[in-house]
């Protein structure tokens, strides 16, 4: 019979304080460490920039000092090149009315754009936005990013799907989970220093995901950011871009009037 509080208990809880955050590890009786609970990050707003309040943001990328944005809604979906400082649209292509634009990724001199339920993606020249081709997608398209080797896609489920950069075929997948709890409704994606940052549909937070294991390493709660004006339930947080050169992180939402540059607490 085990005594209450015995160190021989089958599962003990070890609490560590790390950089102001509490990190919980479950340790079994063999001393084996099981997956830690995700860290929760604070943030500071470093800067704000104008954002088109009519842009139903579905994809966002920052490359060569310019923003590239995909907007949704049938009849008004687009691919845009945007000046960060002013929010001005420098170039734009409007999708045919039947397509609902979704996530985008830049692969060298190409822009890859998903559509929601049409099972098709588009490939554009990054410089002049000319349409180079299209490809079939067996899944719904939600978010898209690029890890310098593979395209990584979300489809509203609790999986990240890995696509071959040349053929666009799905070659692998990983289930996303926070401990033993699956994390679904994954939306817009951004690859940041080995991790995938993911919006979660209809939530004001971003999951930081290890793309190899699917473990959620951390959460960024952005409840404090001002979103769209009014009470539109569709105007959710959606849009993450990373400036690799200057280590800047940008976030916005659907029909939000502002784009935020934020810095995570260390």
Predicted features and spans:
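Short loop/turn segments that connect beta-strands within beta-propeller blades
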Residues: 83-87, 125-129, 165-168, 210-214, ...
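Short coil/turn segments that connect the beta-strands within blades of beta-propeller domains
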Residues: 64-65, 108-109, 148-149, 193-194, ...
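Conserved beta-strand position repeated across blades of beta-propeller domains
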Residues: 61, 103-105, 145, 190, ...
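Surface loop/turn motifs at the tips and blade-to-blade linkers of beta-strand repeat domains
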Residues: 48-53, 93-97, 133-138, 175-181, ...
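Signature of short aromatic-glycine-proline-rich micro-motifs recurring in repeat-based ectodomains
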Residues: 57, 186, 232-241
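Beta-strand-rich domains and repeat architectures in extracellular enzymes and scaffolds
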Residues: 46-78, 93-105
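Conserved beta-strand positions in repeat-built beta-propeller and related beta-rich domains
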Residues: 68-74, 111-118, 153-157, 198-202, ...
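A short helix->beta-strand "capping" segment at the edge of beta-propeller domains
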Residues: 34-53, 87-88
